[in-house]
Regions:
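Residue-level detector of functionally pivotal "anchor" positions at catalytic/ligand-binding pockets or at interdomain
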Residues: 448-457, 476-484, 528-532, 578-588, ...
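Terminal processing/anchoring signals of secreted or surface-associated proteins
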Residues: 460, 467, 496, 515, ...
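Solvent-exposed segments in extracellular or luminal domains encompassing
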Residues: 488, 497-514, 539, 548-565, ...
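C-terminal outer-membrane/trafficking sorting elements
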Residues: 36-37, 630-678
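Short beta-strand edge segments in extracellular beta-sheet folds
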Residues: 475, 522-526, 573-577, 624-630, ...
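Histidine-/acidic-rich catalytic cores in large beta-rich domains
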Residues: 3-452
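Coil residues (strongly favoring Ser/Thr
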Residues: 71, 102, 132, 141, ...
Length: 678
C-alpha cells in the first residue's frame, strides 16, 4: 500500500511544545474546531454562518463568534454584521446585528470582565460630510475631480442582557487636517498626535480608509487597543470615559477623552517621522500580553510585512506613565512615541509569510503560537531558541476537510487567528472533550505522543502518572524540627493543634505543594518569676512598682512582663515610718558661745532645724532659748505643781548639774527638758 505524501494536518509535536487544546476555524467554513497537540479533534461547534473573522472560547464553555451576514452596502475583507454566542451544543443563545445601510460590524470583538461586548464596526461617512472636515478631492483617470465617501471606525459596547449600547467611540470625532483653515478640525498635524489625519492613507479609491482589524481590552488600565493596518499603527484609547467624553478631547482617567493616548508603528501618520521610522506593514492582532505570562503587559503584534515580503511577530514595551494617569510618555513636540526599538521579534523569511489576516499568542511556558493565516498554517516556536516545536496545516478547503496528500490551493484554508488553551482552562468544565479522529480525510498512520509536563518521580508527593516529561516540579515531604520556649498560659499552634504544656509533639501537615510536611515540635515552659520585696518609707514618700505608685503601708501584688515576655509576680510590703519632732527649752547666761545642732545661738528666741532620724525620716528639732543672768534652777517649785525628781537622759536620778540636759519630772505628769549653761 502506497501512503500519500503528507500535505496537511500535524507535521511535528516536540516535547518542548506547550500541551493544550488549540481553537481555530477556517474562514470558508461554518465549523469551529478544538484539537489536541496531536491534531486530533476533541470538540466542534457548528454555526449557520461563516465567521467574519474571530472566534472566542469563553470561560463558561460557550463560543463567542463573529458572523458573516449579507450586506448590500459594504464589501471589504472582514465584513460581518452579526455576533452570536453558541452553547456547547451549538445552540444560538444570543445574537446581535450591526448591519444596516450605514453601519456594519466586522473583523473582531472583545468580551469585557462584566460580560459586555466591544464590537468593531464601520459607519458610512458621506463625501459631502468628509469635505466639510477637510478631506481632499481626487482626480480620476479622465481628469474628473470628485469627493469620496469614507468608512470610519467606531466601537460599540453592548450589554448582551439588554442588547443596549452602553458606550461608544467614533474615530470621526477625533480628526485633524491641515488643508483648509476654514473647515473643521484644522490644525498642525504633528502637534496633535492624539488625532487622526483625515487625508493620510487615503487615495480616494478605497473608502475602507482605516480598516481596523483587531480590538483588545486591558482591565487593569481600562484601555482599548484597536489596530489600523492601513495606517501601519495600533492605537490605544481610554475606556474610562463616558460616551460624551469619548467624543471629546477631555475626560476619563487619562484626561484626554476619546483622543488617541498612544500610537505606534509608523509616526509618518502624525508627521513625526519618515519611511525609516516605519516598523509595521499591514499588521494584525495587536494585543496586550495577559498577566501571568513571561512578557505580561507588553504588546504583541503580527507584523504582516506585505511590503518587505516576510512576516514577523513583534513585541514592544510601551512607555506607560503610571504616575500620569496611565498616559504614555512623549518626550517633546517633535519626536514620535517610543520605544525606538522592538523588545523582541521573530521572523523566518523562507517559511513564514502571510501578507494579510493572522495572529500570535504567548503561551504559559513563554512559547509563541503563530497563525500564519494566508498559509493556513499554525505553528509554535520555542521562545528562547526560535525553534519550531509544533507545526500544523489546516486540512480544509472552504467548508470541507480534504484528504491527506491533497495540497490546499492558495487561500483555500486561510485562518484569521488561533488560540491555545491550557487543559485546566475553566471553559472545559462544561465541555466533554472526546478525542476522535484527525480532521483530514485518509490520514496517515501516526505515532504522535501527547507530551505532558509534570513530576515523573513516583516517590514525590506530586507524582503525575500521566506526565511524560519531567519538568523539575517534583516536591517531596518536608521534615521540620522546631523548638519553642513559652510562658505559662501561652500556647503554640501547629496546624490545627494547640499546645500549652511542655513536651515533644509530632504533626503531619499538608503543604501548598500537595506534600505532607512532618513537624517535630519541642515546647518548654518558663514559669512566672516570683519576687518579694519590703520597703520602709517615710511619710510622704512612695514606691513605684511597674505602672503603680504606692505611698501607704500595706501588702501589694503586681504582675509585670519580663524581657523574655513572661510574667513576673512581685509581692511588695511597705512600712511607713512617721516623721518625728522634739521641743527643747534652754536658759543660758549671756556671752556663752553655744552651738545647737550645728547652728550658733546667742539670742533669746525660737529655733528650728530639720534633721534625719535613725530610720532615715525627717526629725524636726525645736529650741526655745532664754538668755538670763540668774544661775541655777528657776521655778522648781510653785504653787501649782511640785518637782518630783530630776533625771538624766538615761532616766537616772541626778543632782542639779550645769551644761548637761536634765529632765524635770513634776507631780502633774509633765516633764521638762532643761539645760543650764554657764
Amino acid at each position: 500500500m502506497t501512503l500519500a505524501q503528507q500535505t496537511v494536518g500535524l507535521f511535528s509535536n516536540l516535547p518542548e511544545s506547550y500541551n493544550g487544546y488549540t481553537l481555530f476555524n477556517s474562514l470558508g467554513s461554518t465549523n469551529t474546531y478544538l484539537i489536541d497537540n496531536c491534531g486530533v479533534k476533541v470538540y466542534e461547534w457548528n454555526s449557520n454562518f461563516k465567521p467574519a473573522a474571530s472566534v472566542y472560547l469563553l470561560e463558561n464553555g460557550n463560543l463567542l463568534k463573529t458572523s458573516q451576514l449579507d450586506s448590500t452596502t459594504f464589501s471589504f475583507g472582514g465584513t460581518g454584521g452579526g455576533i452570536e454566542i453558541l452553547d456547547p451544543n451549538s445552540n444560538v443563545i444570543w445574537s446581535y446585528e450591526v448591519n444596516s445601510d450605514s453601519t456594519l460590524a466586522h473583523h473582531d470583538l472583545e468580551i469585557l470582565p462584566n460580560g459586555n461586548i466591544l464590537i468593531l464596526a464601520i459607519e458610512l461617512i458621506s463625501a459631502q460630510e468628509a469635505d466639510t472636515c477637510g478631506s481632499l478631492s481626487y482626480t480620476d483617470s479622465s481628469g474628473t475631480v470628485f469627493s469620496a465617501d469614507r468608512y470610519s471606525e467606531m466601537i460599540l459596547e453592548v450589554n448582551p442582557t439588554t442588547d443596549q449600547i452602553v458606550w461608544e467611540w467614533h474615530a470621526w470625532d477625533h480628526l485633524i487636517q491641515d488643508t483648509d483653515s476654514n473647515l473643521l478640525y484644522y490644525g498642525t498635524i504633528s502637534e496633535h498626535p492624539g488625532r487622526i489625519n483625515i487625508n493620510y492613507a487615503f487615495d480616494g479609491t478605497d473608502p475602507d480608509w482605516l480598516h481596523a482589524n483587531s480590538i483588545d481590552y486591558n482591565a487593569d488600565l481600562d484601555q482599548i487597543i484597536i489596530n489600523s493596518p492601513t495606517f501601519n499603527e495600533f492605537w490605544i484609547l481610554d475606556h474610562s470615559t463616558t460616551t460624551a467624553e469619548a467624543a471629546d478631547s477631555i475626560g476619563g482617567f487619562s484626561g484626554n477623552g476619546g483622543d488617541i493616548l498612544y500610537r505606534w508603528g509608523d509616526p509618518q501618520a502624525y508627521n513625526r517621522g519618515d519611511t525609516l521610522d516605519q516598523v509595521f506593514e499591514f499588521q494584525h492582532d495587536a494585543h496586550w500580553i495577559p498577566s501571568g505570562l513571561p512578557d505580561q503587559g507588553k504588546i504583541m503584534i503580527f507584523n504582516n510585512g506585505n511590503q518587505r515580503g516576510y512576516s514577523s511577530i513583534d513585541i514592544i514595551e510601551p512607555p506607560l506613565d503610571t504616575n500620569n494617569s496611565n498616559n504614555y510618555i512623549l518626550t517633546n513636540n517633535s519626536t514620535p512615541y517610543g520605544p525606538l526599538n522592538l523588545y523582541w521579534s521573530y521572523s523566518d523569511s523562507i517559511n513564514f509569510y502571510s501578507p494579510f489576516i493572522s495572529g500570535a499568542q504567548q503561551l504559559e511556558n513563554g512559547n509563541i503560537l503563530i497563525c500564519s493565516g494566508a498559509q493556513g498554517k499554525i505553528f509554535e516556536i520555542e521562545y528562547q531558541t526560535d525553534s519550531v516545536v509544533w507545526d500544523y496545516i489546516i486540512p480544509m478547503v472552504g467548508p470541507n476537510p480534504i484528504a491527506q496528500g491533497t495540497t490546499p490551493p492558495p487561500m483555500g484554508n486561510i485562518c484569521f487567528r488561533a488560540h491555545r488553551f491550557s487543559p485546566s482552562y475553566s471553559g472545559f468544565n462544561n465541555l466533554v472533550l472526546t478525542p476522535s479522529t484527525v480532521i483530514e480525510l485518509n490520514p496517515l498512520p501516526s505515532n504522535c505522543q501527547i507530551y505532558i509536563s509534570g513530576c515523573t518521580d513516583s516517590l514525590a508527593c506530586n507524582y503525575d502518572p500521566l506526565a511524560t516529561i519531567n519538568d523539575s516540579s517534583c516536591v517531596y515531604p518536608v521534615i521540620w524540627q522546631q523548638a519553642f520556649v513559652i510562658c505559662t498560659g501561652d500556647s503554640v499552634v501547629v496546624g490545627s493543634n494547640t499546645y500549652n504544656t511542655a513536651g515533644n509533639y509530632t504533626d503531619t501537615l499538608n503543604a501548598v505543594n500537595g506534600c505532607d510536611s512532618i513537624i517535630y515540635t519541642n515546647i518548654s515552659i518558663t514559669p512566672p518569676a516570683i519576687w518579694q520585696q519590703s520597703y520602709s518609707i517615710c511619710d510622704g514618700d512612695s514606691i513605684v512598682v511597674g505602672s503603680n505608685v504606692y505611698n501607704t503601708a500595706g501588702n501589694y501584688t503586681d504582675t509585670l512582663t519580663l524581657s523574655n515576655g513572661c510574667d513576673s509576680i512581685v509581692y511588695t510590703n511597705i512600712v511607713v515610718d512617721d516623721n518625728t519632732s522634739s521641743y527643747d527649752t534652754l536658759s543660758i547666761i549671756p556671752n556663752i558661745n553655744l552651738y545647737w545642732n550645728g547652728i550658733p545661738v546667742s539670742v533669746s528666741g525660737d529655733y528650728s532645724v530639720t534633721l534625719i532620724n535613725s530610720v532615715g525620716c525627717d526629725s524636726i528639732a525645736n529650741l526655745n532659748l532664754t538668755i538670763t543672768n540668774t544661775t541655777g534652777i528657776l521655778n522648781i517649785n510653785n504653787t501649782e505643781r511640785t518637782l518630783v525628781k530630776i533625771t538624766n537622759m538615761l532616766g537616772q536620778e541626778t543632782p542639779y548639774r550645769k551644761n548637761i540636759p536634765l529632765f524635770y519630772i513634776y507631780d502633774d505628769g509633765t516633764v521638762e527638758k532643761r539645760m543650764v549653761i554657764e
